[in-house]
């Protein structure tokens, strides 16, 4: 997952380059970049995640996960090829878009497989901590991408052009990480098989007749108000952060008048914060509960951060750093409380499908907001370089998204208090 997160965010602190496509031999502009990043979610949105979640419940983590880890690596290889192919900009964009589609579906299903395994391994205790620790390690990949990419693609003087190989350097590093990740996945498969043998479990869910997966179980999930509330919170909360990261440098540089490296360190505070605080907040959720309250606080912190990014005085880096602190805490709090809540409200036999449905609706939002952000920046800048007006307009969009997330978090908290049988706010039973 470290490699997956790195590859997904390898251009986040280089997004400002796409605001001046004449300086790129690749020839993409901000709208093209937004379209490329949205490709991650296409197959996920149009049925891939849901179908694959069902396969996960039928075939198990090891078989299904291995297929999609291979798909993730293949998609990354296709993206890398498109960057160095020398094809016309629109053609290379199409190839990269297809590669990103396969990379995205493979990455998401691999993530579902890992999450499902953690739910199995830590069912008897410390699940929130385990999920928080897994998120922390994965987001180190994001942090690495945000910091290393500007060093791999060094800034050039006005009028100079970035070659195809220069633009593709982060992708080649990502492929190397992906190869190492596949070796680690093989080790994970062996460990999971050993765990099942010791526990007397099967990888797929096919034991008792009453525990068999049925399509009707999906319909029951869609009628589960608790599940729907968590899924919608996921889509709006993650859209306010993940979509923001994709255009981080294009927002932070003009808003706070900082150089590229400062902007990369500024936004890297997000994953670095989760590395430290996601496991700690996981322990808090395990030990004292109140999961929906932490979701509400995290959503409020994200809204505060985006209000700063949109309306704080321009040219003052302090506000940018402060906003990243708030966003980092929110990015740690909400997932630490949200993901462990899912196994509490859905049966084990459809847990893979449940996670896949949440990832599906999340990807629907990510695809839409990435494209919209790229379109806003492209329309605002018109090939004239980074623009503060475009950054502010994008941030207003993210503020609106955060407001919806906050309302959903409040509704979930209110529903939990009125219906304590949900057990979402109870501490871990261990």
What are these regions (language model features)?
Residues 168-187, 392-411:
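Symmetry-related core transmembrane helices of the 12-TM Major Facilitator Superfamily/SLC fold
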Residues 291-338:
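C-terminal transmembrane helical hairpin of 12-TM major facilitator-type secondary transporters
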Residues 38-54, 268-281:
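Central cavity-lining transmembrane alpha-helices of secondary-active solute carriers
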Residues 128-154, 359-370:
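Glycine-rich segments within core transmembrane alpha-helices of 12-TM secondary carriers
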Residues 99-137:
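Cytoplasmic helix-loop-helix junction between adjacent transmembrane helices
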Residues 57-69, 286-299:
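Cytoplasmic membrane-interface "Motif A"-like loop-to-helix N-cap segments
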Residues 11-16, 224-275, 335, 369-370:
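Extracytoplasmic gate region of multi-pass secondary transporters
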Residues 70-89, 300-314:
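C-terminal ends and interior cores of transmembrane alpha-helices
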């Amino acid at each position: 997952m470290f490699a997956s997160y790195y590859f997904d965010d390898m251009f986040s602190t280089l997004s400002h380059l796409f605001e001046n496509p004449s300086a790129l031999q690749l020839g993409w502009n901000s709208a093209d970049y937004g379209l490329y990043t949205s490709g991650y979610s296409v197959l996920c949105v149009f049925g891939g995640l849901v179908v694959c979640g069902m396969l996960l419940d039928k075939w198990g983590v090891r078989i299904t996960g291995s297929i999609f880890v291979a798909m993730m690596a293949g998609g990354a290889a296709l993206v890398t090829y498109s960057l160095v192919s020398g094809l016309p900009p629109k053609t290379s964009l199409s190839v990269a878009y297809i590669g990103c589609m396969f990379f995205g579906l493979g990455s998401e299903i691999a993530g579902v497989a890992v999450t499902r395994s953690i739910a199995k391994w830590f069912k008897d205790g410390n699940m929130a901590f385990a999920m928080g620790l897994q998120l922390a390690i994965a987001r180190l990949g994001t942090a690495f991408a945000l910091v290393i990419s500007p060093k791999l693609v060094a800034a050039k003087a006005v009028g100079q052009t970035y070659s195809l190989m220069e633009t593709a350097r982060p992708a080649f590093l990502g492929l190397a990480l992906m190869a190492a990740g596949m070796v680690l996945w093989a080790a994970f498969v062996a460990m999971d098989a050993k765990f099942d043998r010791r526990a007397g479990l099967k990888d797929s869910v096919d034991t008792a007749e009453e525990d068999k997966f049925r399509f009707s179980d999906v319909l029951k999930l869609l009628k589960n108000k608790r599940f729907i509330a968590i899924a919608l919170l996921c889509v709006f909360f993650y859209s306010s952060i993940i979509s923001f990261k994709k255009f981080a440098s294009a927002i932070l540089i003009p808003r706070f008048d900082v150089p590229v490296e400062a902007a990369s360190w500024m936004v890297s505070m997000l994953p670095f914060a989760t590395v430290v605080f996601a496991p700690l907040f996981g322990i808090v959720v395990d030990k004292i509960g109140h999961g929906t309250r932490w979701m509400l606080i995290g959503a409020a912190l994200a809204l505060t951060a985006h209000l700063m990014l949109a309306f704080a005085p321009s040219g003052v880096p302090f506000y940018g750093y402060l906003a990243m602190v708030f966003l980092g805490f929110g990015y740690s709090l909400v997932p630490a409380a949200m993901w462990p809540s899912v196994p509490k409200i859905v049966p084990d036999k459809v847990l893979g499908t449940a996670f896949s449905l949440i990832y599906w609706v999340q990807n629907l939002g990510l695809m839409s907001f990435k494209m919209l952000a790229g379109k806003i920046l492209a329309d605002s800048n018109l090939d004239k370089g980074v623009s503060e007006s475009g950054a502010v307009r994008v941030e207003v969009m993210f503020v609106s998204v955060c407001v919806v997330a906050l309302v959903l978090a409040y509704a979930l908290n209110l529903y939990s208090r009125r219906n304590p049988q949900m057990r979402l706010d109870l501490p871990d039973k261990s």
